[in-house]
Amino acid sequence: VCSSDLVWRDGELTVRVAYSLCGMTDGKEFDEYQNYLAMMPQGFGDDMLHFNGIGERITWAMNSVGGKRPQTDKDTYYEIVRWAAGRGLAVTMHWNGDENVDELLGIWERVNREFPIRPLRWTIAHLNDASPGTLQRMKDLGVGWTVQDAMYNAGEEALDAAAAQRMPPVVTG
């Protein structure tokens, strides 16, 4: 038993925590998720600590690497997120570049045709250079968007001035 679990069980947790689980073993992620849920179903916990879903790395193969992914990687990813949607799980996906986010959104749109994802609060994390078209697709799906302060720290050099202009304002004080 970890110390944070004891703090929660003893009623001493002072902040609300919703946590996600990620696949730890390349190629065995789906088995891991199924085993997790067999032990700890969606909604585990209470108002202070509860299991929320899967992410930020759903599969190693789809974890925000550049370029196009093989179809087999996309098929495996689809099966996992479809399974998650069918169980009402939140999904958070780490994704860095707008240049190939079409792959991810295409899969999520496919899942959404069978299981609406809007009420599940799915999120793309770290998509620091989302284009207006990408943001519209995300809005249409009801997908959330989280960014890092990477754009505040040399964003124009990391991406380009146009990407930096699309970022929401960062409040620093």
Residue ranges of each PLM-predicted region?
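Histidine-centered active-site/metal-ligand motif
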Residues: H94, R121-W122, H126
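Short, small-residue-biased leader/transition segments that mark boundaries at the very start
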Residues: V1-S3
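Metal-coordinating catalytic core of metallo-dependent amide/deamination hydrolases
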Residues: D5-D102, G106, R110, R137-A150
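Alpha-helix termini
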Residues: V111-P116
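Active-site glycine- and acidic-residue-rich loops that bind
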Residues: D26-D31, A125-P132
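Short acidic capping loops at alpha-helix termini that bridge into adjacent secondary structure
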Residues: D47-M48, R118-R121
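Glycine-rich tight-turn/loop motif centered on a GG-T
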Residues: S64-D73, T123, L159-V171
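Active-site-adjacent C-terminal substructures of enzyme catalytic domains
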Residues: D129-G173
